């Protein structure tokens, strides 16, 4: 996603000089506006939403020590029969869990807003792109064969980018040998991406101006379309994590209810039966953190930087 946004930001507006679009005088302006809209969305991702995503994931990952401290305090309170400390610890922890869920939900809303805007523009851009191709073809431009080649190269680039990402995920596997296998996958992906670069450069060269125009518009559309797909994946992952926060809060809410009932007993071990509940909640937290680490690893190449879009 970062690579696609970078290309959109850096690419200049398509130039229709010398191209006659009979019957569709407004089409060049619409396509230029499509490209500007796509670039604007890419800038929003690069300067705002990306940082918010990284901050949210970092917050989850770094919360691990705080969670462990809460857990140890609550276990000690159970062992000593200290109901007040146990209630206070769980209440404070629930407050922080609810705050983290709120952050995740805010991020989901930002991503959804961006995705919805991009989705609208993708449909408009796609329609205008198809119309342009039809017009150029009718004017004698050999766009069919060139378009097929363009789609093949872009498809290969997307495939190896995904393969590279999958390889990093395999490298994090705990099973013996998986890091080596993941390293091989990443190596293969990068090797093939390197081989595709000359082909992409060749496709950017001017052979026939009408064909080149079709290429520029096609690549811009492909980039914004891939960002749209990537946002869907990010929203799904964060929605799942938000649900995990909610489930974790519910687990501790249940523990609080048990404390009230058990507090009436005189037995010092009256809270011991809550240990399995705490352990289950801890397991849920570890799963949530692992998911955050995995998502963070998947986008670790993202760097929040100042970008200067082309005019």
Swiss-Prot record:
Keyword Iron: no
Keyword Membrane: yes
Record GO cellular component, one term: plasma membrane
SUPFAM superfamilies, per the entry: Bacterial hemolysins (SSF58100)
Location(s), subcellular: Cell membrane
Pfam family, any one: Bacillus_HBL
InterPro entries in alphabetical order: Enterotoxin_cmpnt, HBL
Keywords, sorted A to Z: Cell membrane, Membrane, Transmembrane, Transmembrane helix
Membrane topology per record: Single-pass membrane protein
Domain of life: Bacteria
Transmembrane portions of the chain: 168-188
The protein, known as: Uncharacterized 34.8 kDa protein in hlyA 3'region
